[in-house]
């Protein structure tokens, strides 16, 4: 046989042997790999979608579908790591004999509240170094609530919710850590799903998933000129992978005046008729409970319907909420319908994500005369509601109580408004840890109010007006654009994060107002205003306005922690506002905070009953915008008339001095805090001590003329100080598989003081503020150096009679 044939035979044989060996190896590998299938459920048997199933030590992983099922190919004998937010992570050992897995995850109580929303992002609760209180849906105030603010009742130390009236039209007033301004805004900034400047009345209480309250300066400084009064960040129910489900909730509530003011009865009043100390007492021969005549037991109802579903790539949530609330004062009510839809879509293994949220609310509400309750308390209890002819009884003079029944029945005051919030967000994650997002948002508010008085109203009986009509219509459009990039990276025990962003906000507010009196008939109500005699005689009042306002901001934040033991955060915002003077349109708002997690130290690590113990310190500077435009500019207003060229011509005169140095009020705050958790989170809480000073307070001051054109001027002068301590304590008294009973308590103490009202240029010792309604007509408060804001000022009781009257 030739040699070349031998070589060919040997070469072919070697190739054949190689192919056989490779085939055997593939068959061996295939024989070692198996498909494992299973389902993941919670302790109550509910399937869990979106659970991460990962082959331990590899990048081989899958997620459960909407029914909680999964399938993964791996080598038998390896382990699976099963993780899900809010549940204890499990490690499952596999084998070749069992390829069908039924996995149960237990709820992790300590992790349920582990994510806290901060400005333009979120952090683990253990890494937070500022004074932030996070309240989740499971911990909201139970029962029917009239407004979303009420969900926080008793849950946040330092947050004061005030309801001064039974009027269902008015919501709750909120203040955080005292009053920080004399003439600017005193309410916290509301951020809804990332949109700043929202209103809680625009959303349904049932649609809220969590509320995070940013209380101190180091937390709120990232919001710049709007963070002085704190920030409330609301996250609504979000679309996520889950089985399609439909939920309906309904509730009914009753409300009444629980305790009436202790006033004289008709018999008590009659006994004073012959008392020389009380001249002018008149016994009109009847017994009338005026408060009872204008009040009622109010019935309210709420209906909420929601739909949600979708898979890991595309999911949705939609809801509709209807509320009807009566007020305890007759002819007061509020009716609203709110609809929401949220859509999520993820592409390219979650590297590209889209979010769309639309929330629309329509409200109609009816008001009663603002001083009805006050006049009911002041009215003569022996006076009848109607005279013998069926007409309302009236004193027919000013500075006497008005018949509150007539004031309610003969006045029409109805308001309707629509609030629309829309936002779209796109997020790109090109590499691990890096997220680049762009968000565009639009908020639109349209309102119309119509008010009229009949011929039987006090204004006709006393003043002879023969009907009054007021009509208001206004519209506000807010457009927001935000670009945010954040990057997180861990190097062993070193964890760092960087965030930078840009924000642009454009507000456009416009409206019209008209007033007239003297109807030929009161059958028209607030309509057909053109038929009023005032319109024909050119005595009616009409006006319109338009205001625009812009905010431009650049902001950033750096975070670092070493082994989640030593933590540091610094942020900075550079913001410009069109409302301020030419010399101070831009400002810097820095913040820094640090934390030490003592429970991570070796000397406390073996203390089994201690879950977490963290010390915090933070300092931040925030600003407070003025509430109006053009306050820094030289303005002219219409003045008197002059007879020029054969006709009367209205002139113009200066009414506001320019102030190019007008700027925002500035608040600096130092906060010391301690967070703790014991006994596997059965007992947890926080303690905070703070010191805040608001300087450059805005107020109007008298100035000499000349050199000034007008005798008053808006300027930054005063200073307010707030100091206080806050305590939040939460405990789980009962915790079983089917029952959990939590107790939460808060304590807060705030000492407020007006430090100064004057400086070298502007002087003012005090001024009066607030007023009572008719017929008393006097001031109620005084603003004075050394006093707290809101200090009452008025007459004091001199003495009591022997009868205690």
Stretch-by-stretch model annotation:
Residues 1-340, 344-347, 353-355, 359-361, ...:
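Short, small/polar-rich motifs associated with maturation and membrane association
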Residues 125-126, 222-224, 242-243, 257-259, ...:
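Switch/connector loops and helix/strand junctions flanking conserved nucleotide-binding motifs
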Residues 372-405:
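Acidic, glycine-rich flexible loop segments
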Residues 365-378, 757-763:
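Low-complexity intrinsically disordered tracts that form flexible linkers/tails across taxa
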Residues 60-61, 218-219, 460, 705-713:
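Solvent-exposed beta-strand/loop surfaces of large extracellular or lumenal domains
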Residues 140, 187, 193, 270, ...:
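Extracellular/periplasmic, surface-exposed regions of secreted and cell-surface proteins
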Residues 791, 796-805:
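Short, intrinsically disordered, charge-balanced linker/junction segments flanking boundaries
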